[in-house]
Amino acid sequence: MKQNPLINTNTILQRNPDQLFTMIGDEIVMLDIKHEEYLNMNRHASYIWQQLVTPLTFGELTDHLCSAFDVEKKVCIQDTLDFIAEFIERDIIQIIRE
């Protein structure tokens, strides 16, 4: 997975307000317009998407994830970095301020 060297604990993230998505149960399906494909987000990815309805720092986001799911902090940070980097590349999640 790609990683964005610009992301640190103080990086402020938000979801792209123009992104089209819908809830199906507790998961999200969205249309990635840039790559012309549908994405089915699992419950962890859906949780991240829901948290980013308002801007959060990467550190706040990983704190929320560690509280919501039984995961070690180090694993959470790495997995979340991978996910965020991919979604930044797809312009689904945006960096507001580094």
Residue ranges and their predicted role:
Residues M1-S46, Q50, I96:
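Acidic, low-complexity/disordered tracts enriched in E/D and polar residues
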